[in-house]
From Swiss-Prot:
Tissues expressing this chain: Expressed by the venom duct.
Propeptide segment residues: 20-42
Protein name (record): Conotoxin Im11.8
Gene Ontology MF terms: toxin activity
Classification of source organism: Eukaryota, Metazoa, Spiralia, Lophotrochozoa, Mollusca
Organism: Conus imperialis (Imperial cone)
Keywords, alphabetical: Cleavage on pair of basic residues, Disulfide bond, Neurotoxin, Secreted, Signal, Toxin
Compartments where located: Secreted
GO cellular component terms listed in the entry, alphabetical order: extracellular region
Signal peptide bounds: 1-19
Transmembrane segments: none
Protein family (similarity comment): Belongs to the conotoxin I1 superfamily.
Function of the protein: Probable neurotoxin.
Disulfide bonds: C43-C58, C51-C63, C57-C68, C62-C75
Length: 76
């Protein structure tokens, strides 16, 4: 049972840690993404989607003015 739970947890965390490195806080973003999953929050990849913070928007998008927008600079 413990082995199955460990395997499931690894499968959940692995996609959060893979991908292109765009900043030094990759590990922190992975942890925050995992917290969002446990809170049942999902990010939106739609431009103009309503958001309340930067974790509501996926990828290189930031939450500016309550909407997800594409940015080239890191979100603040």
């Amino acid at each position: 049972m413990k082995l199955a739970l460990t395997f499931l947890l690894i499968l959940m965390i692995l996609p959060l840690m893979t991908g292109e490195k765009t900043s030094d806080d990759l590990e922190l973003r992975g942890v925050e993404s995992l917290r969002a999953i446990f809170r049942d929050r999902r990010c939106s990849d739609n431009i103009g989607a309503t958001c309340s913070d930067r974790f509501d928007c996926c990828g290189s998008m930031c939450c500016i003015g309550g909407q997800c927008v594409v940015t080239f600079a890191e979100c603040s």
